[in-house]
């Protein structure tokens, strides 16, 4: 029996794939658990329309990420924190602090998109990467200054 997968099945396929399985497997397992639909013409057209909508949506998100990357690339933000002796910060600057500073400048960036290897604990200028999409990155400069 031919079925259209509604979820990824390990070793079988992913969403929208049309696969051939035994009738019992389809009728007793895949279809009742809503993991697949019978591969009728109507179902195939329905899944194709869903796939095309997803593709358009992903392309729109990708385009928005590219536009944001152009605006964000090379941007510089300044974060002021209290400092102890030897230029060490009280606490550290984390992705949350950087995201907050970027949002204040008008860039809509989530803290999960900011990539730093470890929290910033010293004064200085740092180059930080921001992951906006699967393969779209922007570099920003974070200037850490003493709060007076």
UniProtKB/Swiss-Prot annotation:
Keywords: Ribonucleoprotein, Ribosomal protein, RNA-binding, rRNA-binding. GO terms for biological process: translation. PROSITE patterns: RIBOSOMAL_L9 (PS00651). Pfam families: Ribosomal_L9_C, Ribosomal_L9_N. It comes from the Bacteria. The keyword Ribonucleoprotein applies. Gene3D superfamilies: Ribosomal protein L9, C-terminal domain, Ribosomal protein L9, N-terminal domain. Belongs to the bacterial ribosomal protein bL9 family. Binds to the 23S rRNA. This is Large ribosomal subunit protein bL9. It comes from Hydrogenobaculum sp. (strain Y04AAS1). The gene is rplI.
């Amino acid at each position: 029996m031919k079925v259209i997968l509604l979820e990824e099945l390990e070793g079988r396929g992913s969403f929208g794939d049309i696969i051939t399985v035994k009738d019992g497997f389809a009728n007793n397992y895949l279809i009742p658990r809503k993991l697949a639909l019978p591969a009728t013409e109507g179902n195939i057209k329905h899944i194709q329309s869903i796939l095309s909508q997803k593709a358009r949506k992903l392309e729109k998100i990708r385009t928005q990420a590219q536009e944001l990357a152009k605006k964000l690339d090379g941007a510089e933000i300044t974060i002021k924190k209290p400092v102890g002796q030897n230029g060490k910060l009280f606490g550290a600057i984390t992705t949350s602090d950087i995201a907050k500073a970027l949002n204040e400048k008008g860039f809509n960036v989530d803290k999960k998109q900011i990539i730093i290897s470890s929290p910033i604990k010293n004064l200085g200028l740092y180059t930080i990467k921001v992951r906006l999409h699967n393969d779209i990155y922007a570099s920003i400069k974070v200037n850490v200054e003493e709060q007076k």
